[in-house]
Structure formats: C-alpha cells, structure tokens
C-alpha cells in the first residue's frame, strides 16, 4: 500500500516536468492565437507583452521546484544578453518570498513575472514545465519548446536569429 501511494505521489509530482532529452522546438500551434500576457513583476509593477512590440521576446514558464527549469537558467541568461531580445520568466503560482529566495540564490538577468493563479500557464503552455515561447516583433508567438532547453541547443538560437535577421538588414540598409 505504501509503495503504491509513494509511486503515485512521485508520478503526480513529476508529471508536468520535462527534461532536456524530451525538449523539441516546434512552431506555435497553427490557428492558435497568441494569448495576452499581462502580469505583475516582483515589485508589483504591471507588465504587458504588447509593450514590447518591435523586439523578439522569449517567454519562459518556470517554478523553483522544477529541476529542468533551474538547469536551463544559463541558456536563458545568455539569451537575455543579446541585442533585440527580451527574456521574461513567468513563475508558476509560487509565493513572493519563495521567488525572492530563489532569485537571490540564482541571480537572473531578466524580468520575472508572477502567474499567481496559473491562468497564463494554462493559456500559453501544454501543461508542462518548463515551456519557452518565442514571440516575434509583431507580438505573434512563433515557436515553442516544451521541456528544458539543452545548453548546446542550436535550434532555438537559429529560430531567434531568423527573426532578428530582417531587423538587422533594415538597420544596415538605413546606414
């Protein structure tokens, strides 16, 4: 009885977590509109995805208890340092003090938003963490990775570079 209960609890705990070997970059589902994303940051300031039109935005859904989420932090940190890209981490339903302790131990170079109710997670993801979405300069979701982004992943970088290329060409032609 105990073994069956323990196994059930472990299954429930890890059912929504995907390691890197399971991650795959895929186009945003055809016909599925890009949901709005309006949440508060850790200081309680309102934040709206629509305000970032003109930039490529990488939206990452995570939680401090999610091992693959923690493992992919260096990849997201590298992306956040690139011109023309904004990385936003959306924390799933954790208390503010938990998020603050986590970000103190793992300094993030990007904005963290709070999804207190889990509604944004439901609208943006297939229910698996981590999930990372690439939004183009017009505000349209283009790509989604379900599961941990591997440290050596070239597909996500190439997809972002392809979105940035037309912008770089326009800037070069204006000079």
Question: Residues of each region from the PLM?
Answer:
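Structural microenvironment flanking redox-active thiols in thiol-disulfide oxidoreductases
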Residues: 70-106, 116-122
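Hydrophobic beta-strand core positions in alpha/beta domains
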Residues: 58-60, 89, 133-134
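Thiol/disulfide oxidoreductase modules built on the thioredoxin-like
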Residues: 101-109, 116-164
């Amino acid at each position: 009885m105990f073994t069956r209960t323990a196994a059930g609890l472990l299954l429930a705990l890890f059912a929504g977590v995907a390691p890197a070997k399971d991650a795959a970059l895929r186009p945003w589902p055809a016909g599925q509109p890009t949901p709005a994303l309006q949440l508060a940051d850790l200081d309680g300031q309102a934040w709206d995805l629509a305000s970032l039109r003109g930039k490529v935005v990488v939206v990452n859904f995570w939680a401090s208890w999610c091992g693959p989420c923690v493992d992919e932090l260096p990849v997201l940190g590298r992306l956040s340092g690139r011109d023309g890209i904004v990385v936003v981490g959306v924390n799933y339903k954790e208390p503010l003090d938990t998020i603050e302790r986590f970000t103190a131990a793992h300094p993030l170079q990007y904005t963290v938003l709070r999804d207190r109710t889990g509604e944004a997670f439901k609208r943006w993801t297939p229910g698996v963490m981590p999930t990372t979405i690439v939004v183009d300069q017009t505000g349209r979701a283009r790509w989604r990775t379900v599961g941990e982004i591997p440290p050596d992943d070239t597909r996500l970088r190439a997809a972002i570079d392809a979105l940035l290329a037309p912008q770089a060409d326009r800037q070069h032609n204006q000079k």
